[in-house]
């Protein structure tokens, strides 16, 4: 008797094995940038070989630390029924389309507009569609992510997206919008967040999740297979994730 599922599994493994995997999560380590009102990431060597006979670390962090996903409940008090544990674990297993603006030398407060998204699609020949993930690369992570005394500049300053850009992705019926900044569409200037139409109007109210603080976006192809799972956190406002993208060779 043969296992009827073996063939399908072999096909998936062979397909993924022939693709290039890109790790999209920055390392969780002491000193990484954090939203100012969130606790510092703490990693404590709570159990050691010398003292206890084995090794285990204790970790304390906000749900929105490092690469993470925002659920509607994060920003919307009337959507507390949509915490991260109400979404399927495979919700973020889908194709993703890259919108790469890393060559524009964006400054804090600069906005990506719907016209810029359309122009990029014309240039790349790829358009995000229903059920896919839109990935916007500002070039922010590569330029400003650090873990030293200047780490917080990354979260205190950022470009963002205009309201019509946020509506653009909503109208495409995407599953999620992902970026390499701390707050996706929210531009930040000297620690002051500007408008956040994606969080409050265009995305979260429509169950479009928000993925933030991704790295290595410059390694992506125009379309890739995106895979990430949130932790199964009871009533979670969001969750850290370990996202990867599989790109054609």
Give the label of every model feature segment.
Residues 1-249:
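Active-/binding-site microenvironments in catalytic and ligand-binding cores
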């Amino acid at each position: 008797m043969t296992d009827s599922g073996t063939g399908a599994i072999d096909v998936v493994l062979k397909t993924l094995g022939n693709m290039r995997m890109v790790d999209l999560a920055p390392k969780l380590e002491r000193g990484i940038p954090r939203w100012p009102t969130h606790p510092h990431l703490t990693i404590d060597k709570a159990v050691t070989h010398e003292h206890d006979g084995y090794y285990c670390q204790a970790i304390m962090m906000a749900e929105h630390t490092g690469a993470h996903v925002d659920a509607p409940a994060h920003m919307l008090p009337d959507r507390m029924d949509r915490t991260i544990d109400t979404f399927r674990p495979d919700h973020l297993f889908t194709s993703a389309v890259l919108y790469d603006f890393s060559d524009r030398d964006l400054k804090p407060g600069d906005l990506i507009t719907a016209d810029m998204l359309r122009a990029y699609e014309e240039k790349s020949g790829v358009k995000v569609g229903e059920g896919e993930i839109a990935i916007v690369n500002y070039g922010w992570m590569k330029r400003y992510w650090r873990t030293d005394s200047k780490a917080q500049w990354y979260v205190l300053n950022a470009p963002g997206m205009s309201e019509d850009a946020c509506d653009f992705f909503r109208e495409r019926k995407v599953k999620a919008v992902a970026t390499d900044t701390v707050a996706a569409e929210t531009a930040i200037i000297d620690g002051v967040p500007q408008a956040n139409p994606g969080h409050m109007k265009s995305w979260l109210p429509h169950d479009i999740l928000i993925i933030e603080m991704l790295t290595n976006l410059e390694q992506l192809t125009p379309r890739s297979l995106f895979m990430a799972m949130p932790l199964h956190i009871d009533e979670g406002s969001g969750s850290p994730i370990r996202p990867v993208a599989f790109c054609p060779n």
